[in-house]
Amino acid sequence: MARDYYGLLGVSKNASDADIKRAYRKLARELHPDVNPDEAAQAKFKEISVAYEVLSDPDKRRIVDLGGDPLESAAAGGNGFGGFGGLGDVFEAFFGGGFGGGAASRGPIGRVRPGSDSLLRMRLDLEECATGVTKQVTVDTAVLCDRCQGKGTNGDSVPIPCDTCGGRGEVQTVQRSLLGQMLTSRPCPTCRGVGVVIPDPCQQCMGDGRIRARREISVKIPAGVGDGMRVRLAAQGEVGPGGGPAGDLYVEVHEQAHDVFVREGDHLHCTVSVPMVDAALGVTVTVDAILDGLSEITIPPGTQPGSVITLRGRGMPHLRSNTRGDLHVHVEVVVPTRLDHQDIELLRELKGRRDREVAEVRSTHAAAGGLFSRLRETFTGR
């Protein structure tokens, strides 16, 4: 049976907090062990101290007013489940400790909170990724309210504690069940969990301390960035509720495909089509490199189809150093498909002079260093 805490202090259930405090002090002066050494007085002093502790706590007093005893609920097997042993822990694991008298208060979430990060996607061509670029972009984020400077109030008014939750940011409900008393908490619907309300809010931000606005900012993209990389701009994201500190803005790079070059990390690849005669005799071709302008590339005599000529340090710059990747030039030998009579005679003459060179069928993995040769060595050791 619940103890009569009001009766212990000699006050009614409608007593104010001041009445309860006054009654406790009066009894404490009479029953304090330093004044009254009698054992019965000491026991009585402990009882009124417990009663004052319960009734001065709004949550515990609410349980008393509903016919419960917060101390019995807390002591009876943990969170008001009595002889059910660990069953209270099971419900606490599933329902966040919202049972019995032991439901912990989360407290207000705070009116001023940090803002969230923002993401902006930016398309860049290969040249811009190679050289770096500074661009003006338009972002749409929450910014500090310029009328109230983030306070959310109108003029000199200030936030005040919420009457509904008493500044705790949450409201609690006690219900009886077969398992005992159940205490549940939920965010206060009046203050939305922050614990305070603004009686005279700013008419521009309506008390939020921030407004949405479009603004232009300068974004500096460093040389060497690649597709999917992000550049962080500190404190350029969303301003937080109540004028809280802004989050960060992340600019995500989307690299557009190039007409000539294919990027592989810091390396660049391109293909040069060389006529059959030039591949046999050798030739110099000109490539418009990304960072080096027009560059001459020497195709040596006897270059075979699929050959790769590597130009060291002529690729993309490394993002965090002064080094550069390589430029790989893939040679494609073009065999003529249309020949006139003179072309045919010249080729036949060449064939006659090189009659020892005949077509032959070879195993694909016969050539040293070929793909099949390397696979065979890997699996057979030969």
From Swiss-Prot:
Pfam families found in the cross-reference section: DnaJ, DnaJ_C, DnaJ_CXXCXGXG
GO BP field: chaperone cofactor-dependent protein refolding; DNA replication; protein refolding; response to heat
Residues given in the record as Zn(2+) 1 binding sites: C145, C148, C202, C205
Zinc finger residue ranges, CR-type: 132-214
InterPro entries in the cross-refs: DnaJ, DnaJ_C, DnaJ_domain, HSP40/DnaJ_pept-bd, HSP_DnaJ_Cys-rich_dom, HSP_DnaJ_Cys-rich_dom_sf, J_dom_sf
SMART domains named among the record's database cross-references: DnaJ (SM00271)
This protein's domain notes: The J domain is necessary and sufficient to stimulate DnaK ATPase activity. Zinc center 1 plays an important role in the autonomous, DnaK-independent chaperone activity of DnaJ. Zinc center 2 is essential for interaction with DnaK and for DnaJ activity.
GO molecular function: ATP binding; heat shock protein binding; unfolded protein binding; zinc ion binding
Binding, Zn(2+) 2: C162, C165, C188, C191
Source organism of this protein record: Mycobacterium tuberculosis (strain ATCC 25618 / H37Rv)
Compartment annotation: Cytoplasm
Note: Was identified as a high-confidence drug target.
Gene3D superfamilies: 6.20.20.10, DnaJ domain, Urease metallochaperone UreE, N-terminal domain
Cofactor(s) needed for function: Zn(2+)
The protein's role, per its UniProt record: Participates actively in the response to hyperosmotic and heat shock by preventing the aggregation of stress-denatured proteins and by disaggregating proteins, also in an autonomous, DnaK-independent fashion. Unfolded proteins bind initially to DnaJ; upon interaction with the DnaJ-bound protein, DnaK hydrolyzes its bound ATP, resulting in the formation of a stable complex. GrpE releases ADP from DnaK; ATP binding to DnaK triggers the release of the substrate protein, thus completing the reaction cycle.
SUBUNIT field: Homodimer. Interacts with RNase J.
Cellular component, GO annotation: cytoplasm; peptidoglycan-based cell wall
Cofactor binding comment, as recorded: Binds 2 Zn(2+) ions per monomer.
Family, per entry: Belongs to the DnaJ family.
J domain location: 4-68
Protein name per its UniProtKB record: Chaperone protein DnaJ 2
